């Protein structure tokens, strides 16, 4: 009897606990699916994905050269030592194993190709991933990217040969093509207000910068004291948590009506758009100094200023703070003066060019920090000003689907980071470090005037379609007419009769509309 009552009480208690947990889960789910809160959670998920991708990109900097030196540039050989008898005759011999350096192993080429393989595969994959994102939305590609990055990180943790590490690095490039493009496109899609979009993309850029700058000391410390696998396992665990959080917020594989989704513009059409091409060129140009300096500046510091290991290890760390400052300033300026995004980008290119030309003149670590900080400040200006401009260009010229246009942005970054590890060392060897920096600086300064081409586009207000600004024609089709009428009505003060225009009136009004 007592046992039966105890079982009954236990069942009742379990039922209450289960009911309470279910109710709490519903509340949490409801709170997470509240539109504004869900948008913020998705921003956090995307920022974590950006952080992980850039940490995985840079965490190998202090690890791989030392690890490859161990597994590839030394080979195990056996040396035979003869033992002579008392009368000088050879009685026996002994063998001992020693590590002998392999003179034929080209470490620089191996490391350069390994570093560049991620950007190369990312560059090749982006045209396809951009189209895929436009077709299926942003959540599924983001989940695919996080999954690929998880397996790439696990492979890095336990890989012991150059071939396995190369495969893991290339696999990360494929994951980045999905995660980076879909993540940035998701932010542009969720934050439609220009000032909010610029701020959200600025936050994502801050996480990208933080991941790139904090990863080398993070990886170096854990590698030295805990082993090669520890930093990669930590990153894979965070990647897993980010994927789980994404599944809690969205249901990527739930049934949905694809026929109601907007059809994005093909990526090849976006690539030949002159405005988008100018922005893409600026994104590539501004990242060339960073991509080419990362593999070469340490050796130059060692030869020129006899820099210590810790100085070379934290070379880029102080630059994180001016990068954040650049993001903050650009976001504030864009909110107050949104029509001058092109100007902020042009100023950033000039700062990058001047900083790059100044670097070879530095003779100690303290002097070097100043141009490096200015360099990252300029990059922040360019990225924060021009990434939202890509979404704006798609909004006013095409359909507001952002997968392909941010695939183009990712291609722009990948071009710089694919060429840097492979070409930078050879350029320094053939021409010199000074000539490399002067060339990069000159390219950035000369490209800045090209952003004047965006001046007229940036003057357009987000509520206007480019069809009646640049092409001087009215909206085509009933959908365009209704949208334009609604947008104009929203801009008119209360009491205006603009909301009662007929289709004919709207068409007539817009054919002669200029602002």
From Swiss-Prot:
Entry membrane topology: Multi-pass membrane protein
Membrane-spanning segments: 41-61, 113-133, 140-160, 170-190, 202-222, 230-250, 272-292, 311-331, 342-362, 368-388, 405-425, 433-453
PROSITE patterns: MFS
Positions glycosylated per UniProt: 84, 87, 92, 306
Tissue distribution: Electric lobe.
Subcellular location: Membrane
GO molecular function terms noted in the UniProt entry: acetylcholine transmembrane transporter activity
Region called Disordered, residue ranges: 489-515
Xref: InterPro entries: MFS, MFS_dom, MFS_trans_sf, MFS_Vesicular_Transporter
Sequence ranges on the Lumenal, vesicle membrane side: 62-112, 161-169, 223-229, 293-310, 363-367, 426-432
One GO term (biological process): chemical synaptic transmission
This protein's record includes keyword Nucleotide-binding: no
Cellular component GO terms, alphabetical: AP-1 adaptor complex; AP-2 adaptor complex; terminal bouton
Superkingdom assignment: Eukaryota
Spans within the Cytoplasmic topological domain: 1-40, 134-139, 191-201, 251-271, 332-341, 389-404, 454-515
Main location: membrane
Keywords associated with the record: Glycoprotein, Membrane, Neurotransmitter transport, Transmembrane, Transmembrane helix, Transport
Task performed by this protein: Involved in acetylcholine transport into synaptic vesicles.
Domains: entry comment: Two classes of cysteines are involved in transport of acetylcholine. Binding of acetylcholine to VAChT involves one class of cysteine located at the cytoplasmic N-terminus and binding of vesamicol involves both. Organomercurial-mediated modification of two cysteine residues inhibits binding of vesamicol.
Family indicated by similarity: Belongs to the major facilitator superfamily. Vesicular transporter family.
Name by which UniProt lists this protein: Vesicular acetylcholine transporter
The organism's taxonomic lineage, starting at the top: Eukaryota, Metazoa, Chordata, Craniata, Vertebrata
């Amino acid at each position: 009897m007592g046992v039966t009552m105890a079982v009954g009480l236990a069942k009742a208690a379990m039922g209450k606990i289960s009911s309470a947990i279910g109710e709490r889960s519903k509340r949490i789910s409801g709170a997470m699916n509240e539109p504004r809160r869900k948008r913020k959670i998705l921003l956090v998920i995307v920022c974590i994905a950006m952080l992980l991708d850039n940490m995985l990109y840079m965490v190998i900097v202090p690890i791989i050269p030392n690890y490859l030196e161990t597994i590839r540039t030394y080979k195990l050989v056996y040396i035979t030592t003869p033992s002579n008898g008392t009368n000088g005759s050879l009685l026996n011999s002994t063998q001992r194993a020693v590590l002998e350096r392999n003179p034929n192993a080209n470490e620089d080429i191996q490391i350069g190709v390994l570093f560049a393989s991620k950007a190369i595969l990312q560059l090749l994959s982006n045209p396809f991933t951009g189209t895929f994102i436009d077709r299926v939305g942003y959540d599924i590609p983001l989940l695919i990217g996080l999954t690929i990055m998880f397996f790439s990180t696990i492979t890095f943790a336990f890989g012991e040969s150059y071939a396995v590490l190369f495969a893991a690095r290339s696999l990360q490039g494929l994951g980045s093509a999905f995660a980076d493009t879909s993540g940035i496109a998701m932010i542009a899609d969720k934050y439609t207000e220009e000032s909010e979009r610029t701020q959200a993309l600025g936050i994502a850029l801050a996480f990208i910068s933080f991941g790139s700058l904090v990863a080398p000391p993070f990886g170096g410390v854990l590698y030295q004291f805990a082993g090669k696998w520890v930093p990669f396992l930590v990153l894979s665990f965070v990647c897993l948590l980010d994927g789980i959080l994404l599944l809690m917020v969205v249901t990527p594989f739930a049934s949905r009506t694809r026929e109601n989704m907007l059809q994005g513009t093909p990526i090849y059409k976006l690539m030949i758009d002159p405005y988008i091409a100018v922005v893409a060129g600026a994104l590539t140009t501004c990242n060339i100094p960073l991509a080419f300096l990362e593999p070469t500046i340490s050796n130059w510091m060692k030869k020129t200023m006899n820099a210590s290991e810790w100085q070379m290890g934290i070379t880029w760390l102080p630059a994180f703070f001016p990068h954040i400052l650049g993001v903050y300033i650009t976001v504030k300026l864009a909110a107050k003066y949104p029509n001058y995004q092109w100007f902020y980008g042009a100023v950033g290119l000039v700062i990058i060019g001047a900083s790059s030309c100044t670097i070879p003149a530095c003779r100690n670590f303290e002097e070097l920090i100043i141009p490096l900080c200015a360099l990252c400040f300029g990059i922040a200006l360019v990225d924060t000003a021009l990434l939202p401009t890509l979404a704006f260009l798609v909004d006013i010229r095409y359909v507001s689907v952002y997968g392909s246009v941010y695939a183009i942005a990712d291609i722009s970054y990948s071009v710089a980071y694919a060429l840097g590890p492979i070409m930078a060392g050879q350029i320094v060897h053939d021409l010199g470090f000074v000539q490399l920096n002067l060339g990069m600086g000159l390219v950035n300064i000369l490209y800045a005037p090209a952003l004047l081409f965006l001046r007229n586009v940036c003057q357009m207000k987000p509520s206007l379609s480019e069809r009646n600004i640049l092409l001087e024609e009215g909206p085509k089709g009933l959908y365009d007419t209704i949208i334009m009428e609604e947008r104009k009505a929203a801009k008119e003060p209360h009491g205006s009769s603009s909301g009662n225009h007929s289709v004919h009136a709207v068409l007539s009004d817009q054919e002669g509309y200029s602002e």
